[in-house]
UniProtKB/Swiss-Prot annotation:
Cross-referenced InterPro entries: AAA+_ATPase, ATP-synt_VA_C, ATP_synth_F1_bsu, ATPase_a/bsu_AS, ATPase_alpha/beta_chains, ATPase_F1/V1/A1_a/bsu_N, ATPase_F1/V1/A1_a/bsu_N_sf, ATPase_F1/V1/A1_a/bsu_nucl-bd
Organism of origin: Morus indica
EC number: 7.1.2.2
Listed name of the protein: ATP synthase subunit beta, chloroplastic
Binding site for ATP: G172, G173, A174, G175, V176, G177, K178, T179
Gene: atpB
Membrane topology recorded in Swiss-Prot or TrEMBL: Peripheral membrane protein
C-alpha cells in the first residue's frame, strides 16, 4: 500500500509553488485553469486556489483535475463552494491526488472529503496520509476463501448471512431502524472481531449525520472520555455540498478503511449511506463537464465509476473490508440504472420492513425479502441451509394463511395449519433481539447470539419441542435458553396473579 508520510494539512500534500496556473473561467463548481506550456497537471491531481475575495476574506478552495482541454487548459471540479473566486487568481498544482489522514488518529472523529476534521475537537495527527485514488488489489492479493461474517444478529446470520469481505445492500425507508442496525453492527464487529468501522455519509441530510453522531456518543460507540477507544471514523459529504465533494467522499472513507485492512490487518466494516447519492453526484459532475448523458440522464461512465469504487472493497490476505451500503431506489423502480448497477455488486440484501417495525419486532428485517448468495449448503453447511429453508417455508405459509385468518378466524384452519401459524408466530418473535446500542433507550441488556446457538434455537422451534411455550416468551430474547427461562417466569407470574 502506498502511504505518503507528510506533515502538511490533510487534503493536499505540502504546497510548493513549483507549478502555477491561473483561473481562466468559472462555471459554478467547475473551473478552467490555464498553465504554462509543458506544465500541465495530471488527471486527478489536486489543485489549490488561495487568495482573498473582493471583501478581503481568505479563500482556500481545493479542486480535482477532470479533463485536459488542450491549449494548456485543464477543467477541474471544486470540492467546496466557489464563491468569491475570480478569473486570473493563482492556482497551485500540488502534483499529486487528494490525500487524507489514515490510521488510529481518525477514530472517533468526523472528517470532510479533504480529510479535515469538522467536529471542533482540534487538529488530527496527519503524519500518515494516503491518496484517495488507488487501483483495486491485484488478483494475487485477493482472499478467495468464502467465509461467513458472523454479526451476532439472529435474523441476519440465519436467513441472509453476510460474506466476509462482501457487499450488502440495506434497503429501508425512514424510521424502520436502519441507524440502530448500523450502530449495532459497528458495536458487534468491534467486540467479536476486534475490528473497526468507517462510516461514509454520501449526500445525506446534515441533520441525520448529526443525529447518528449524537447517538453514537450516547451508546458508547464513540468514547468521548478517551477518543482513541472509539470504534468508528466518520466521513461526511452532505446534501448541501458541491457535487465534486459528494462524488469523492465515498473514496475518502474507503481510503481510511483500506489502511486498517492493509496496514493494521484488521477486519473493517465500511458503511456508505447512500450509494445512490454517489451515482447522483457523478451524474451532476458529468453534465457539468459537458459529457453526453446516457440512459435516464445518467453519466455514460456510470458502470466504470461504480466499479472503481466497489472493486476496492474486498478481502485480501491481510484483512477484509465488508461493506454495508444503504440503497435508495428512485420511485421504487428497481430497473433504474443506478440501483440496477449497484445490484450487480451486492452479495446480500437486508430489507427492513415497516410492517414488522409497526408490530414492534426489532430488528425489523424482512425474513422473506432479504437474500444472500452465501446461503448455499456447500458454504454454510447442510444443517444451517435446511434450518433456514424450513424457517422461510413456515413464514411463507403463515403469510399465505393471513387472509383466511383475517376473514374466518383461526378456528377454521386445519390442525396442521394451526400448528404452522403457532410456530411461525414464535419464529417471528424469536427473530427479534435486544441490541447493545439500544440498552440506553430500552433498559434491557443487549445480546450477541452466535451462529450455532441461533441454528439450535430455530431447530427446536421447528421440531415442535417448544409448542407448549407462550409466544411472548420468544420476544426480545437472545438464545433459546433465555426463551425457556422467560416462559417459566411468565408461568410463575400468572400463578401468583391467580
Amino acid at each position: 500500500m502506498r502511504i505518503n508520510p507528510t506533515t502538511s494539512s490533510p487534503g493536499v500534500p505540502a504546497l510548493e509553488k513549483k507549478n502555477l496556473g491561473r483561473i481562466a473561467q468559472i462555471i459554478g463548481p467547475v473551473l478552467d485553469v490555464a498553465f504554462p506550456p509543458g506544465k500541465m497537471p495530471n488527471i486527478y491531481n489536486a489543485l489549490v486556489v488561495k487568495g482573498r475575495d473582493t471583501v478581503g476574506q481568505q479563500i482556500n478552495v481545493t479542486c480535482e483535475v477532470q479533463q485536459l482541454l488542450g491549449n494548456n487548459r485543464v477543467r477541474a471540479v471544486a470540492m467546496s463552494a466557489t464563491d468569491g473566486l475570480m478569473r486570473g487568481m493563482e492556482v497551485i498544482d500540488t502534483g499529486a491526488p487528494l490525500s487524507v489522514p489514515v490510521g488510529g488518529a481518525t477514530l472517533g472523529r468526523i472528517f470532510n472529503v479533504l480529510g479535515e476534521p469538522i467536529d471542533n475537537l482540534g487538529p488530527v495527527d496527519t503524519r500518515t496520509t494516503s491518496p484517495i485514488h488507488r487501483s483495486a488489489p491485484a488478483f494475487i492479493q485477493l482472499d478467495t476463501k468464502l467465509s461467513i461474517f458472523e454479526t451476532g444478529i439472529k435474523v441476519v446470520d440465519l436467513l441472509a448471512p453476510y460474506r466476509r469481505g462482501g457487499k450488502i445492500g440495506l434497503f429501508g425507508g425512514a424510521g424502520v431502524g436502519k441507524t440502530v442496525l448500523i450502530m449495532e453492527l459497528i458495536n458487534n464487529i468491534a467486540k467479536a472481531h476486534g475490528g473497526v468501522s468507517v462510516f461514509g455519509g454520501v449526500g445525506e441530510r446534515t441533520r441525520e449525520g448529526n443525529d447518528l453522531y449524537m447517538e453514537m456518543k450516547e451508546s458508547g460507540v464513540i468514547n468521548e472520555q478517551n477518543i482513541a477507544e472509539s470504534k468508528v471514523a466518520l466521513v461526511y459529504g452532505q446534501m448541501n455540498e458541491p457535487p465534486g465533494a459528494r462524488m469523492r467522499v465515498g473514496l475518502t472513507a474507503l481510503t481510511m478503511a483500506e489502511y486498517f485492512r492493509d496496514v493494521n490487518e484488521q477486519d473493517v466494516l465500511l458503511f456508505i449511506d447512500n450509494i445512490f447519492r454517489f451515482v447522483q453526484a457523478g451524474s451532476e459532475v458529468s453534465a457539468l463537464l459537458g459529457r453526453m448523458p446516457s440512459a435516464v440522464g445518467y453519466q455514460p461512465t456510470l458502470s466504470t465509476e461504480m466499479g472503481s469504487l466497489q472493486e476496492r472493497i474486498t478481502s485480501t490476505k491481510e484483512g477484509s473490508i465488508t461493506s454495508i451500503q444503504a440503497v435508495y431506489v428512485p420511485a421504487d423502480d428497481l430497473t433504474d440504472p443506478a440501483p440496477a448497477t449497484t445490484f450487480a455488486h451486492l452479495d446480500a440484501t437486508t430489507v427492513l420492513s415497516r410492517g414488522l417495525a409497526a408490530k414492534g419486532i426489532y430488528p425489523a428485517v424482512d425474513p422473506l425479502d432479504s437474500t444472500s448468495t452465501m446461503l448455499q449448503p456447500r458454504i454454510v453447511g447442510e444443517e444451517h441451509y435446511e434450518t433456514a429453508q424450513r424457517v422461510r417455508q413456515t413464514l411463507q405459509r403463515y403469510k399465505e394463511l393471513q387472509d383466511i385468518i383475517a376473514i374466518l378466524g383461526l378456528d377454521e384452519l386445519s390442525e396442521e395449519d394451526r400448528l404452522t401459524v403457532a410456530r411461525a408466530r414464535k419464529i417471528e418473535r424469536f427473530l427479534s433481539q435486544p441490541f447493545f446500542v439500544a440498552e440506553v433507550f430500552t433498559g434491557s441488556p443487549g445480546k450477541y447470539v452466535g451462529l450455532a446457538e441461533t441454528i439450535r434455537g430455530f431447530k427446536l422451534i421447528l421440531s415442535g419441542e417448544l409448542d407448549g411455550l407462550p409466544e411472548q416468551a420468544f420476544y426480545l430474547v437472545g438464545n433459546i435458553d433465555e426463551a425457556t427461562a422467560k416462559a417459566m417466569n411468565l408461568e410463575m407470574e400468572n400463578k401468583l396473579k391467580k
